[in-house]
C-alpha cells in the first residue's frame, strides 16, 4: 500500500467543487480544506506507485480548477490513530 499526501492549489471559486470532485475519485481517502500556502490537502492510499501515477497524472489532472499540485510519498505512519486501528481489528467493545 502506498500512501501519498497531495497538496493542491485551486481557483478560489472552485475550491469546494474541486474538493467534492476529488473526494469521489477511487484511491483518494481524505480531502481537507486548509489555511496556508495550499488550498487543499489530499490523502491518497493506492496499491502501488503505478496506481499513484495514474491517479495524479490522469484522474486528478482532469479535475477542472486545479492550478498546481505537489505530491509527497509517506514512508512510515506514526499516528496513534493508525496504530489503534491496526490493533483493534477483530475486537469489539
What would you call each of these model-derived segments?
Residues 1-93:
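A compositional/biophysical signature of low hydrophobicity enriched in polar/charged and small residues
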Amino acid at each position: 500500500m502506498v500512501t501519498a499526501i497531495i497538496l493542491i492549489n485551486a481557483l478560489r471559486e472552485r475550491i469546494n467543487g474541486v474538493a467534492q470532485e476529488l473526494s469521489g475519485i477511487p484511491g483518494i481517502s481524505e480531502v481537507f480544506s486548509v489555511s496556508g500556502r495550499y488550498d487543499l490537502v489530499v490523502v491518497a492510499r493506492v496499491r502501488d506507485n503505478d496506481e499513484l501515477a495514474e491517479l495524479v497524472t490522469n484522474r486528478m489532472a482532469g479535475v477542472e480548477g486545479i492550478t498546481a499540485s505537489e505530491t509527497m510519498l509517506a514512508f512510515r505512519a506514526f499516528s496513534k490513530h493508525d496504530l489503534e486501528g491496526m490493533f483493534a481489528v477483530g475486537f469489539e467493545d
